């Protein structure tokens, strides 16, 4: 089987939506029966985004096999059925780390190690490995054409086009076509200069995706085609839309998938986008709306919680309601009090790290518990719910996590000190261990209690969810907390770790150590988020009586 590659680049400005465009195209090709995957190549020096600030980089998306990756991989999984792995994302830092390790081992036999060919060869090897077994691979190059950081990646894909053959490679370039209000027209010059920059590297784009706040007129697309040496039918207008799930249909309506299949000589049926049409219909025709408060510490950049926000929207689709998300800084809860949590139909506390704002989250969990407001805690959101219950119900005054207060009297949350690496070897770690790549990561099995709410929601006794944490519930202090009324609703497959807790005498209070948002999709939703949004809707109705 021959694998075909579509290399996706961006020009003029960043944040054009390369990831969404690539994922949307992949969704169309998948709907034609093709086996599709997507890769993201990030030009930063970090080995992975695991230790990067969420405020700078956005969320870290965790794959089933435990890779900490770029948030674009979340978009990929929400648009296509293929599950991402550590092969689908790598960085300049990872490439240099691998090459330098080989140099130290003597693998290069004394050769002078250079960007070309050693770095570019390493990039090509990883792209080829990630594409094995697929009909079409979309490869998104992070950054903007013209950046110094992305040059090795651009050189590598230029070489791949020559080595694999142009009949099996395509270059798709996203570019900005701005509208100038003073002139009353869109301007194509930035696109022309961006393509000129690509040409100077040796890459002639085959497809141009023209991003604009409005549809790019046919005469302007013809002008772009002429000056950029691209067929007119391969100049695609991609205007701003009110729902990203409309983009597959928008691209298909302009024949992009037909052009690609013809270019790759692929014989496959027409794309059936009925599932996406259903998503769009549900989104556009809600029967009501709810307001959910998300209390976190990175709220100045909503992308820090991208998958959670999307999962809440998916929960809304499954309940035919619009979910309005109110982002609340947990430090504001500390300074202004729980009064700012009024008028919410439900409360969610997502994952996070560090002590800043934790007391505000604990106060939020208490407010939700005492006022019978639906509550969903994720990762740290479970830990603060446990701490709150231990303090205020189980009588463990000043209970805390050793992450925040190492010598606290009641360390109800503590560091997991024994781990297993990718090869199954036992590792012992402490608070002094490296932060990068030292968490419980990836898909883990969880056994659900028969009498639990989550057992009803999932409809099965055993589930698999993705994790990203290094602190866990301290089993040594669990008995008095359970005796006070907290229910352990889920445990790890080996029965060692607490994965889900519930408050039984509460309408809907669920907190989980894993990250259910990573497996939620617009077409399928997720049991926890669907149940949570339903509980919010029911709470709203009770309050209205």
Curated annotation (Swiss-Prot):
Mg(2+) binds at residues 72, 140. Gene3D superfamilies: 3.40.50.880, P-loop containing nucleotide triphosphate hydrolases. Residues 1-266 are annotated as: Amidoligase domain. L-glutamine binds at residues 352, 380-383, 403, 470. It catalyses: UTP + L-glutamine + ATP + H2O = CTP + L-glutamate + ADP + phosphate + 2 H(+); L-glutamine + H2O = L-glutamate + NH4(+); UTP + NH4(+) + ATP = CTP + ADP + phosphate + 2 H(+). GO terms for molecular function: ATP binding; CTP synthase activity; glutaminase activity; identical protein binding; metal ion binding. Pfam families: CTP_synth_N (PF06418), GATase (PF00117). CDD domains: CTPS_N, GATase1_CTP_Synthase. Signal peptide: none annotated. This is CTP synthase. CTP binds at residues 14, 147-149, 187-192, 223. Pathway: Pyrimidine metabolism; CTP biosynthesis via de novo pathway; CTP from UDP: step 2/2. Residues 291-542 form the Glutamine amidotransferase type-1 domain. Its EC number is 6.3.4.2. Keywords: ATP-binding, Glutamine amidotransferase, Ligase, Magnesium, Metal-binding, Nucleotide-binding, Pyrimidine biosynthesis. It is an enzyme of class 6 (ligase). It comes from Klebsiella pneumoniae subsp. pneumoniae (strain ATCC 700721 / MGH 78578). Homotetramer. The gene is pyrG. CTPSs have evolved a hybrid strategy for distinguishing between UTP and CTP. The overlapping regions of the product feedback inhibitory and substrate sites recognize a common feature in both compounds, the triphosphate moiety. To differentiate isosteric substrate and product pyrimidine rings, an additional pocket far from the expected kinase/ligase catalytic site, specifically recognizes the cytosine and ribose portions of the product inhibitor. The lineage of its organism: Bacteria, Pseudomonadati, Pseudomonadota, Gammaproteobacteria, Enterobacterales. One of its GO terms (biological process) is pyrimidine nucleobase biosynthetic process.
């Amino acid at each position: 089987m021959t694998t075909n590659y579509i290399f996706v680049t961006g020009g003029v400005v960043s944040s054009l939506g390369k990831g969404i465009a690539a994922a949307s195209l992949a969704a169309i090709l998948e709907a034609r029966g093709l086996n599709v995957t997507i890769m993201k190549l990030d030009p930063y020096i970090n080995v992975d985004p695991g230790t990067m600030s969420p405020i700078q980089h956005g969320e870290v998306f965790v794959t089933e096999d435990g890779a900490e990756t770029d948030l674009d991989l979340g978009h990929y999984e929400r648009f296509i059925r293929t599950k991402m792995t550590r092969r689908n994302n790598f960085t300049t830092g990872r490439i240099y780390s691998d090459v330098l390790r080989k140099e130290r081992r003597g693998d290069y036999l004394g050769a002078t190690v250079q960007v070309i060919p050693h770095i570019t060869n390493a990039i090509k090897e990883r792209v080829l490995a990630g594409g094995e077994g697929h009909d079409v691979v979309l490869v998104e190059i992070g950054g903007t054409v013209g950046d110094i950081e992305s040059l090795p990646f651009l050189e590598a894909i230029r070489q791949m086009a020559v080595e694999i053959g142009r009949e099996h490679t395509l270059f798709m370039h996203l570019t900005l076509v701005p509208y100038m209000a003073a002139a009353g027209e869109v301007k194509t010059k930035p696109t022309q200069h961006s393509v000129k920059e690509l040409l100077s590297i040796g890459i002639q784009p085959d497809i141009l995706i023209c991003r604009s706040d409005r549809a790019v007129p046919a005469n302007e697309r013809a002008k772009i085609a002429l000056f950029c040496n691209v067929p007119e039918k391969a100049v695609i207008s991609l205007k701003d839309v009110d729902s990203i799930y409309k983009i597959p249909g928008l691209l298909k309506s302009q024949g992009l998938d037909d052009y690609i299949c013809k270019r790759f000589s692929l014989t496959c049926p027409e794309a059936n986008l009925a599932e996406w049409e259903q998503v769009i219909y549900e989104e556009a025709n809600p029967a009501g709306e709810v307001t959910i408060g998300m209390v976190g510490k990175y709220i100045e950049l909503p992308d820090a919680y991208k998958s959670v926000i999307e999962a809440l929207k998916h929960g809304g689709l499954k309940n035919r309601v619009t979910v309005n998300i109110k982002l609340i800084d947990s430090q504001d809860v500390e300074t202004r009090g729980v009064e700012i949590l009024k008028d919410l139909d439900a409360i969610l506390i997502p994952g996070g790290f560090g002590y800043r704002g934790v007391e505000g989250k604990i106060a939020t969990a208490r407010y939700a518990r005492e006022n019978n407001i639906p509550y969903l805690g994720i990762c740290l959101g479970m830990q603060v719910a446990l701490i709150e219950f231990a303090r205020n119900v189980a009588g463990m005054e000043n209970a805390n996590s050793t992450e925040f207060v190492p010598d606290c009297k009641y360390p109800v949350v503590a560091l997991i000190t024994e781990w297993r690496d990718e090869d199954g070897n036992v590792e012992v770690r402490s608070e002094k261990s490296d932060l990068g790549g030292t968490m419980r990561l990836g898909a883990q099995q969880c056994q659900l209690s028969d009498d639990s709410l989550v057992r009803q929601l999932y409809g099965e006794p055993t589930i698999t969810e993705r994790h990203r944490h290094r602190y866990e519930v301290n089993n040594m202090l669990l008995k008095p907390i359970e005796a006070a009324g907290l229910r352990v609703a889920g445990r790890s497959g080996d029965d060692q770790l607490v994965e889900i807790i519930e408050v039984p005498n509460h309408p809907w209070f669920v907190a989980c150590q894993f990250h259910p948002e990573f497996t939620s999709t617009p077409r399928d939703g997720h049991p926890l988020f669907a149940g949570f949004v339903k509980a919010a809707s029911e709470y709203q109705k009770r309050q209205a009586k």
